[in-house]
UniProtKB/Swiss-Prot annotation:
It is found in: Cell membrane. Its main location: membrane. Keywords: Cell membrane, Membrane, Transmembrane, Transmembrane helix. It comes from Bacillus subtilis (strain 168). It comes from the Bacteria. It holds the Pfam family YoqO. This is SPbeta prophage-derived uncharacterized protein YoqO. Disulfide bonds: none annotated. GO terms for cellular component: plasma membrane.
């Protein structure tokens, strides 16, 4: 059920973002919904962690998501001021997205591995 809700929220946020202006409130809400729906999609793995661990993981996820969002908005403003080809800007932003998401996933994997419960119910 959480996978269905996560996928529905993901597509809904993409549709709202595509039809809203960049700095509008609906665009910001849709961006937040995007990250929340990704978290809901991965909620099936929550039984492997204690409540305190889930709080740490969720806070880390939202901080990293906010950091990636701010990094992308900063880079788009920076690239708009530089007079270079649109294709180069597009490739640089795609590279920035892939790199920052890969780093965020590595950080989340490291934190999740450290906080996972042992078979006896205690955390590592």
């Amino acid at each position: 059920m959480s996978k269905t809700i996560g996928i529905t929220g993901f597509f809904l946020s993409i549709v709202v973002q595509s039809f809203s202006a960049n700095d509008s409130l609906s665009h910001k809400i849709a961006t937040g919904l995007l990250f929340v729906s990704i978290a809901i999609y991965n909620f099936d793995h929550a039984k492997d962690y204690s409540k305190a661990s889930l709080v740490v993981i969720c806070l880390t996820f939202f901080v990293l998501a906010l950091g990636i969002h701010k990094l992308l908005s900063f880079s788009s403003d920076l690239f708009d001021n530089v007079n270079i080809n649109f294709g180069v800007i597009f490739i640089l932003q795609i590279t920035l997205i892939i790199g920052s998401v890969a780093i965020a996933i590595s950080i989340m994997k490291f934190i999740c591995d450290r906080l996972k419960k042992k078979p006896n119910g205690k955390e590592c």
